Amino acid sequence: MKVALIQKKYYGNTKKTVKKTLIDIEIASDSGAELIVLQELHQSEYFCQSEDVTFFAYANSWEKDILFWSEVAKKNSVVLVTSLFEKRTAGLYHNTAVVFDKDGTVAGKYRKMHIPDDPGFYEKFYFTPGDLGFEPIETSIGKLGVLVCWDQWYPEAARIMTLKGAELLIYPTAIGWFDEDSKKEKKRQLESWITIQRSHAIANGVPVLSCNRVGFEKDSSGVMDGIHFWGNSFICDPQGSLLAQAGEEETILYATVDRERTKEVRDIWPFLRDRRIDTYKDLLKRYCD
């Protein structure tokens, strides 16, 4: 199965950014991709660099966004993984991945469970933690374990998705560096980000697709300069081997995912078989003290 990750920068406004994204979706579809993944919050800038109530306005188009991306998926006959700002009601918002099937129907959605609150990533101000659990989304091309960005640092999320039958793990993402970070620190952060996700592929015997954004986005509050989103979107197989990896520029990243490889890998590395589920109760504690 041919898959595509669309790694884009923000073009200063939603209209232009979406227009550029639509062009790439059409290109990817024409190139034979059956599954297309977009980055986290792909319609707008990464507004979570500061706490500003005016940014909640981005969520006002939630229902229209659903209809719009549904038509995009249908027009291009692709399974489309989007990342949208969900307005559930006034004062209650989610960072939500919505998956559309090839006929435009909503196959399912996932509300981001792990919400960061770090300098430049003030997501707790905007997003309520997800309440839909870790549920794979059934589509015409298989069961997709869709998670979002900060979720990628948690092996528990990947494991539960796998135990519930996910055939792919997918991470729409927005992550990058600050200018004050040293070259060595930037290298460490990027390598850690790639390593943790490849480890999810290995530990669970499933392919991983991680789609990040690129470009520099200023901090609108002026407290910090802004974030250089590092891109490096990638696709790896069930043994963590890289099938394709992007750099720091805009691109459409393609790979062919062989889902039969999951069975082959799990037969020689039966990690699920050897789990000692009778000994894991301490995982339900915040800390063992």
Task: State the predicted function of each range.
Residues 88-196, 264, 268-270:
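Active-site catalytic loop in hydrolytic enzyme cores
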Residues 14-15, 23-102, 109, 175-206:
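Cys-nucleophile CN-hydrolase/nitrilase-fold catalytic domain and related Cys-dependent amidase chemistry
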Residues 1-4:
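Extreme N-terminal starter segment of soluble prokaryotic enzymes
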Residues 7-12:
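Short polar catalytic/cofactor-binding loops
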Residues 262-289:
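A conserved C-terminal secondary-structure "cap"
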Residues 61-81, 143, 152-252:
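CN hydrolase (nitrilase-like) catalytic-core segments centered on the catalytic cysteine
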Residues 82-84, 96-99, 135, 233-235, ...:
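Short beta-strand scaffold segments in enzyme catalytic cores
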Residues 16-26, 154-159:
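Short, acidic/polar
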